[in-house]
């Protein structure tokens, strides 16, 4: 029997397929351009497949996926898919752990859509589509916000008018929780400890840090939205909120237009004026491009600043600093540049270990380092599949 993991947006469905018994991933892929002309379904199985198929909505995409799974002999029939686990960005404050999918859970996700208008609606469309396409399957959800439900009031509150904050539900929610939780569980196994204290640096195009104490999130850099925190690929991270008003007045721009700039044209892309892909910016850095050097130094400093704050929060017993996600796992340059800017402890990277390709995980610090530094590959899909299995065992 199989477990299907779904991560859906408004016009796409990313998926991964796992064997239920041993949780081995056997396939992955994406259905793109749902509701748009020239739809494409890509599947990686025994080889890479690509199909040009128009899909008018998520239900048609779900049905086409199942047909193609049978066509390429990934499954014999749809009944082999016993469990489906969905990634949902926002569960508000009510959904604080992976949950079986029932009408109450769906209602909470619908209610939380106002906090994640770009993400939750697509997930809901996919949930409803697979309920119809695979009526026998048992469904569960993992929330990106859930791991951060352990953050206390001091750390999740914003110093704005209290009545307004209460009325509108304005607080830090945090994101990337599935990844932060996966890394927490993995570090426990690596260190053979029942609980761990560490700072996790999930650095991809989107990026967030998490302070983990006794294996629970006590603070995280993203906030009410994923725009908060450190500088990212295209997102600004933290800025003075009055910049909004100033730019809108000076440029005769709407709040929505400037918020879009902060989300899509800022960060590494906006500062470097080169690309949101760090590899391109690193290449220009090596060639002495002044704007690339400035962008990467600013980026590294923003990450180091948050890391230092979080090391202070989890002290005195600090088990590790962990780098994960696309940049964290693959950029030796960024890891070195960030660690060199953290001065509160003597943290030393082993140049050779930091430079080599990382497998599942790698210790990259020296024996003299006061805090061990690891690179650990994250696997959100495996976390979702594992939870789906546990919830339905």
Swiss-Prot record:
| Catalytic activities | acetate + ATP = acetyl phosphate + ADP
Q: Which Pfam families match?
A: Acetate_kinase (PF00871)
Residues the entry annotates as binding Mg(2+):
7, 380
Membrane-spanning ranges? none
EC numbers, comma separated: 2.7.2.1
The annotation note on the cofactor reads:
Mg(2+). Can also accept Mn(2+).
Binding-site list for ATP: 14, 202-206, 277-279, 326-330
Superkingdom classification of source: Bacteria
Under the heading InterPro entries, the entry gives: Ac/propionate_kinase, Aliphatic_acid_kin_short-chain, Aliphatic_acid_kinase_CS, ATPase_NBD
Q: Which residues bind substrate?
A: 87
**GO cellular component term, pick one:** cytoplasm
Q: What's the top EC group for this one?
A: transferase
| Pathway assignment | Metabolic intermediate biosynthesis; acetyl-CoA biosynthesis; acetyl-CoA from acetate: step 1/2
Residues of the active site are: 144 (proton donor/acceptor)
A molecular-function term among this protein's GO annotations: magnesium ion binding
Which residue positions hold the site described Transition state stabilizer? Answer: 176, 235
* Gene Ontology process terms (BP): acetate metabolic process; acetyl-CoA biosynthetic process
Ordered alphabetically, the record's keywords are: ATP-binding, Cytoplasm, Kinase, Magnesium, Metal-binding, Nucleotide-binding, Transferase
| Compartments in which it is found | Cytoplasm
Tell me the cofactors it needs: Mg(2+); Mn(2+)
Family the UniProt entry places it in: Belongs to the acetokinase family.
Q: How does it assemble?
A: Homodimer.
Q: What does this protein do?
A: Catalyzes the formation of acetyl phosphate from acetate and ATP. Can also catalyze the reverse reaction.
- This protein is called Acetate kinase
């Amino acid at each position: 029997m199989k477990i299907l993991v779904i991560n859906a947006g408004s016009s796409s469905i990313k998926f991964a397929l796992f064997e239920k018994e041993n949780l081995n991933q056997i396939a992955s892929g994406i259905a793109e351009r749902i509701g748009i002309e020239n739809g494409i379904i890509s599947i990686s199985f025994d080889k890479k497949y690509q199909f040009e198929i128009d899909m008018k909505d998520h239900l048609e995409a779900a049905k086409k996926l199942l047909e193609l799974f049978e066509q390429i002999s990934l499954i014999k029939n749809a009944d082999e898919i016993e469990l489906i686990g969905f990634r949902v960005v926002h569960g508000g404050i009510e959904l604080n752990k992976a949950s079986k999918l029932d009408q109450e859970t769906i209602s909470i996700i619908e209610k939380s859509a106002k906090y994640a208008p770009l993400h939750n609606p697509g997930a809901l469309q996919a949930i409803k589509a697979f309920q119809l396409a695979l009526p026998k399957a048992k469904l569960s959800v993992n929330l990106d916000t859930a791991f951060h439900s352990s953050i206390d009031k001091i750390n999740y509150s914003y110093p704005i008018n209290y009545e307004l904050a209460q009325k509108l539900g304005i607080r830090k929610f945090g994101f990337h929780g599935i990844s932060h939780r996966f890394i927490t569980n993995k570090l426990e196994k690596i260190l053979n400890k029942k609980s761990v204290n560490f700072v996790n640096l999930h650095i991809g195009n989107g990026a967030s840090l998490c302070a983990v104490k006794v294996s629970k999130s006590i603070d995280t850099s993203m906030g009410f939205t994923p725009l908060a925190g450190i500088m990212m690929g295209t997102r600004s991270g933290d800025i003075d909120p009055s910049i909004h008003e100033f730019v809108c007045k000076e440029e005769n721009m709407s709040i929505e237009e400037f918020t879009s700039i902060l989300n899509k044209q800022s960060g590494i892309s906006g500062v470097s004026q080169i690309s949101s892909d760090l590899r391109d910016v690193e290449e220009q850095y090596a060639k002495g491009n002044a704007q690339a050097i400035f962008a990467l130094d600013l980026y590294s400093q923003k990450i180091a600043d948050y890391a230092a704050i979080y090391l202070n929060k989890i002290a005195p017993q600090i088990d590790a600093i962990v780098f994960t996600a696309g940049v964290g796992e693959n950029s030796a340059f960024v890891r070195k540049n960030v660690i060199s800017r953290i001065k509160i402890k003597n943290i030393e990277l082993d140049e050779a270990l930091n430079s080599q390709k990382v497998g599942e995980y790698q210790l990259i610090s020296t024996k003299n380092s006061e805090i061990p530094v690891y690179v650990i590959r994250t696997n959100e899909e495996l976390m979702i599949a594992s939870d789906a299995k546990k919830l339905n065992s």
